[in-house]
């Protein structure tokens, strides 16, 4: 069993509740994002505090260094419209066609199409299109939350399904916190003055493995919902 060391919190529950409320409000009111133009428009006016080279960015959508990455994500929507067999899937939760990046794979064929979609997007963009982390996360969490509930009688899986369903109905981009905080990049993880800038095993007991450390969101979260 993997456990979190009580002295370090890897998830901020207050922030999670606020985000959950926003998602619920957005998905009840707005129609799903389907096109590249709709996606780009959805990123405006979010009042994010984004700093680039020490300067506050007023509107990330219009920044010349950020916009190319937004255009790459937008291509994931454009591909879904041009080639729905490759870029979309039918959700078992909504019964509707959704962007494949929001789909929980249910078969080997799903995984094959997922890989072909990623390969095609790589050919089209020549860069990172920033949705793989979110897609991989929901597929991993689908299994992990089910196993946790089966072992401990908790309700994580149902809440996870509710979250994914909201994201699918809204057509949102899901980001991920996957990057270690790094600290002094000239030093290896075990050489850091603060070991918690990298996620690491802090102790092992008969009950399981305990972990400590920080994860930071990827840069692509600027372009996520």
Predicted regions and their residues:
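N-terminal-proximal low-complexity accessory segments that begin disordered
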Residues: 30-76
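Internal helix-loop-helix
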Residues: 78-174
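Beta-sandwich/jelly-roll carbohydrate-recognition scaffolds of carbohydrate-active enzymes
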Residues: 162-164, 187-200
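A short core secondary-structure module
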Residues: 214, 218-225
């Amino acid at each position: 069993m993997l456990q979190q060391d009580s002295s370090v919190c890897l998830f901020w529950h207050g922030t999670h509740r606020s985000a959950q409320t926003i998602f619920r409000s957005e998905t009840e009111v707005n129609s799903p994002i389907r096109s590249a133009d709709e996606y780009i428009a959805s990123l405006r006016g979010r009042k994010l505090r984004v700093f680039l080279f020490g300067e506050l960015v007023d509107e990330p959508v219009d920044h010349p260094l950020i916009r190319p990455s937004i255009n790459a994500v937008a291509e994931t929507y454009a591909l879904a419209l041009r080639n729905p067999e490759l870029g979309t899937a039918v959700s078992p939760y909504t019964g509707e066609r959704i962007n494949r990046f929001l789909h929980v794979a249910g078969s080997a064929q799903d995984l094959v199409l997922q890989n072909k979609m990623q390969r095609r997007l790589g050919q089209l963009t020549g860069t990172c299109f920033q949705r793989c982390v979110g897609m991989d996360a929901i597929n991993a969490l689908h299994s992990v939350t089910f196993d946790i509930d089966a072992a401990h009688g908790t309700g994580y899986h149902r809440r996870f399904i509710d979250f994914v369903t909201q994201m699918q109905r809204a057509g949102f981009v899901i980001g991920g916190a996957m990057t270690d905080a790094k600290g002094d990049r000239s030093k290896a993880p075990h050489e850091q003055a603060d070991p918690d800038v990298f996620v690491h095993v802090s102790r092992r007991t008969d009950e399981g493995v305990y972990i400590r450390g920080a994860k930071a969101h990827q840069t692509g979260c600027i372009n996520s919902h």
